[in-house]
Amino acid sequence: MIGGRLKSLRGKRTQEEIASHIGVSRARYSHYENGRSEPDYDTLQKLADYFQVTTDYLLTGKDKKSDDDMFSDPDLQLAYRDMQDFSPESKQQAIEFINYLKEKEKNRKPKNK
């Protein structure tokens, strides 16, 4: 049930804090947690974004294999968030630099003899 997952994800945050962030009243958010109502798709997506989980996780408790799995490292999460504000040119440069580092790393690994 989505309510239990929302309660667990909320942790020490208040219902008011989360409700404000996703644009619903505290009472409405409370209804989601208590199973009295289900969020619509847009609200579900906002909740998933806020908690940094997939909508699949919120709905089923299971995360299908997704790009989110690649971001378990906090440093990578931060880098990804920072890149969201980059211009298209800067994003392209970042991608090219990452590809350069990937090639460099591949060439550093010792080959099996």
From Swiss-Prot:
CDD domains: HTH_XRE. Keywords: DNA-binding, Repressor, Transcription, Transcription regulation. InterPro entries: Cro/C1-type_HTH, Lambda_DNA-bd_dom_sf. Residues 6-58 form the HTH cro/C1-type domain. SUPFAM superfamilies: lambda repressor-like DNA-binding domains (SSF47413). SMART domains: HTH_XRE. Residues 15-34 bind DNA. GO terms for molecular function: DNA binding. It comes from the Bacteria. Repressor of PBSX. Binds to four sites close to its own gene. Necessary for the maintenance of the lysogenic state. The defective prophage of Bacillus subtilis 168, PBSX, is a chromosomally based element which encodes a non-infectious phage-like particle with bactericidal activity. PBSX is induced by agents which elicit the SOS response. This is HTH-type transcriptional regulator Xre.
